[in-house]
């Protein structure tokens, strides 16, 4: 990550903090999202990070020191190739090109994938972002995750504000898919435009 990119991320994070302090917060920026991922990882004990929506790989790279293993999924072929080059020096990161709906089962079937934090940020948002069969596959991805709940420590769904817009599931549908994910041990929070689902310790 370049010095200019890092400085811009810090500046954006300061703006987020200022907006929070003035009750005018709307959309968290990259570094703010990373700090939340880091907090969830530490609270849940997650050692493996699965991300859908690699984009340019900046969040992935920031997460590299926080997890033993990272698998990130990008549907757009060019973005995935660029991310592989950007992240090539991070030996604990694997970049996969494909649809999260197809990739998730293959990843979670691996015996060495345990104590996982899944970060669902793989939706079409215009510009160069990739698009699958549906604009926002989060609810479909969560249905897949239910089959592997014993491997998960937590998951996060990003951009909660977008749900209910054309092409996106309703907010209520997303919450319904999340609220009993870990049965009686589910802790669900909506914070900084993200839905966070944690497995509570027994």
Model-predicted regions and their roles:
Residues 1-117, 123-202:
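A short alpha-helical cap/connector motif
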